């Protein structure tokens, strides 16, 4: 068993990775700004440029990876940014990219994914469509630690 103790006065530094849908990001930033979420969010990284307005509004550093040569280059940039900002925890807020095993292994038990459906019932990017096709009347979200790559 592994555990880690931390002072409660210490506020975790959290980076948020997001793709083009920014409603999850908006909620996290609002809750942090209002004091409901006790952490710092000094960094937002996206594989799209259209989400830049929220970080600008909240005064948070925004770094798009849209000019990366490939997935490996994008992940290297992300790792560098996480190190520069001394990030403790990474939140994937509708980040629609599959992270490599190498990336995940660099941040053991420090990545939380917010998935836009009830797992394990609806896996993947089209979970709303899957729920609709099954006649589901109530949808929600699931969050979980990312500790290994399924593929």
Task: Label the predicted regions.
Residues 1-151:
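One-carbon transfer enzymes
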């Amino acid at each position: 068993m592994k555990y880690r103790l931390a002072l409660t006065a210490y506020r975790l530094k959290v980076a948020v990775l997001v793709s083009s849908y920014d409603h999850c990001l908006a909620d996290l930033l609002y809750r942090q700004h209002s004091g409901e979420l006790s952490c710092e969010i000094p960094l937002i990284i996206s594989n799209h440029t259209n989400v830049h307005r929220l970080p600008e509004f909240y005064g948070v550093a925004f770094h798009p990876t849209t000019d990366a040569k490939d997935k490996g280059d994008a992940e290297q940039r992300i790792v560098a940014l996480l190190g520069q900002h001394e990030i403790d925890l990474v939140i994937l807020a509708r980040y629609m990219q599959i992270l490599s095993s190498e990336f995940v292994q660099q941040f053991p038990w420090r990545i939380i994914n917010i998935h836009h459906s009830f797992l394990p019932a609806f896996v993947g990017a089209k979970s709303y469509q899957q729920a609709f096709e099954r006649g589901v009347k109530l949808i929600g979200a699931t969050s979980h630690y990312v500790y290994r790559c399924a593929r």
